[in-house]
A protein has these predicted regions:
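Short, small-residue-enriched loops and turns at beta-alpha junctions
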Residues: 135, 204-209, 236-239, 265
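Short secondary-structure boundary segments
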Residues: 37, 131, 260-262, 291
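Small/aliphatic-rich secondary-structure junction motif
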Residues: 1-64, 165-234
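Structural beta-alpha unit
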Residues: 40-43, 50-53, 69-127, 224-257, ...
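Charged helix-capping and loop-helix junction motifs
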Residues: 142, 212-216, 245-248, 271-276
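Intrinsically disordered or low-complexity boundary/linker segments at protein termini
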Residues: 1-20, 24, 93-101, 105, ...
Length: 291
C-alpha cells in the first residue's frame, strides 16, 4: 500500500505535475502526501556562490544576495503551487473523510536540499519527483543520489498530463535483483492497472529466446495476481538503446514504466550502468525506479 508519499518541491513550474501525479497515484490508497520544500541553508548558498564566481563577473557578495533572493522566491512559488493544488483537490479532505481519499500537508525546512530530501524519503512509501527544469534543484545527478540513498521507490514525472498514470504499465525486465525489487515495490500500482506489459531487450545478435521466456514467466506470475499481462522480447542494437524499449512501451499505450536502477559496482554505487543513465536522461514516460 502506498500510504505515505513524499513530493519534494523546487519552486519551478513542474512542481505542479509532481503534485498531480502524487494525487493520481495516492488517491486510491487514501495516501498522505507530504509536500517538502528544503530551503537551502546559508552555507549551501555561500558554497554555490563560490562555485559560480568562476564564471561570473559579479562579486561573491552580489552572487550570495542573488542566490538568497532566488531561493526565497522559489520557496514562495513552491508554497503557492502547493496551496493551489490543495485548494483544487484536497480542501474538503484536509482532516480525512468518511468517503476516503488522499490528504496532504506542507512542510518547509532549511538545510541541504539533496541530503535532507533523501533523509525524509526514508520515511515514505514513494517519492514523486518532477523531472528537472533547466537550472532546477534536482538535476540527474541529484536524482541519482536521492534514488540510491533513500532506499525507496522514486516516481519521476515528465512534463506530461499525469491524469492517466498507471492505467497501462510497462516493466523493463531483466532477470536481476534490481528489476525484481522494482516490480515488488510497484505491486500496489500493478494490481490496479488495466494491463501490464513485460518488456525485455537483448543486444544485437543475441538470442532472445531465454530473455523472452523470462519475461513470459514474470507475466505469468503477475497474472496469478489477477493482472491482465503480456510479454515481448525486443532485439536491440549494439548498445541496447533504451529508446527501442521506450518506443515499444509507448506503442502499447503504456503511461508508466517500471525499471530497476542498476549500478556498475557495489564499491562505487553512485556510478549507474549505461542503461539506467540513458533511461534517466531519455525517458519521456513517468518512470518508477528502485535501486
Amino acid at each position: 500500500m502506498l500510504k505515505n508519499i513524499l513530493v519534494p518541491l523546487t519552486g519551478f513550474p513542474n512542481d505542479a505535475n509532481a503534485l498531480e501525479a502524487a494525487f493520481v497515484v495516492g488517491w486510491p490508497f487514501d495516501a498522505y502526501i507530504e509536500a517538502l520544500r528544503v530551503h537551502p541553508e546559508p552555507m549551501e548558498i555561500v558554497m554555490a556562490a563560490a562555485v559560480r564566481q568562476f564564471a561570473s563577473k559579479k562579486s561573491n557578495r552580489e552572487l550570495v544576495l542573488s542566490l538568497q533572493a532566488d531561493a526565497a522566491s522559489r520557496t514562495n512559488l513552491a508554497k503557492e503551487t502547493f496551496d493551489q493544488f490543495f485548494k483544487r483537490h484536497l480542501a474538503a479532505h484536509a482532516f480525512g473523510s468518511a468517503t476516503g481519499g488522499a490528504t496532504a500537508a506542507w512542510r518547509q525546512m532549511e538545510g541541504n536540499p539533496v541530503e535532507d530530501t533523501t533523509a525524509a524519503a526514508r520515511f515514505s512509501d514513494l517519492v514523486v519527483l518532477a523531472r528537472a527544469a533547466e537550472g532546477g534543484q534536482f538535476p540527474a545527478d541529484s536524482v541519482a543520489n536521492i534514488l540510491i540513498g533513500c532506499g525507496r521507490p522514486v516516481l519521476l514525472v515528465p512534463d506530461v498530463d499525469p491524469g492517466a498514470i498507471g492505467s497501462i504499465i510497462a516493466i523493463a525486465w531483466k532477470e536481476k535483483a534490481e528489476a525484481a525489487r522494482a516490480v515488488t515495490a510497484a505491486m500496489p500500482l500493478l494490481a490496479r492497472a488495466k494491463k501490464v506489459v513485460v518488456l525485455t531487450m537483448n543486444e544485437e545478435g543475441a538470442d532472445t529466446t531465454e530473455s523472452t521466456q523470462s519475461a513470459q514467466r514474470l507475466a505469468s506470475q503477475l497474472a496469478r495476481h489477477g493482472m491482465a499481462t503480456e510479454a515481448h522480447g525486443l532485439a536491440a542494437g549494439p548498445q541496447a538503446d533504451p529508446q527501442i524499449l521506450l518506443g515499444k512501451a509507448k506503442e502499447l499505450g503504456a503511461n508508466l514504466l517500471v525499471a530497476g536502477a542498476y549500478s556498475h559496482s557495489r564499491v562505487s554505487e553512485l556510478v549507474f550502468g549505461g542503461f539506467t543513465r540513458a533511461i534517466l536522461r531519455k525517458c519521456d514516460l513517468p518512470l518508477f525506479l528502485l535501486h
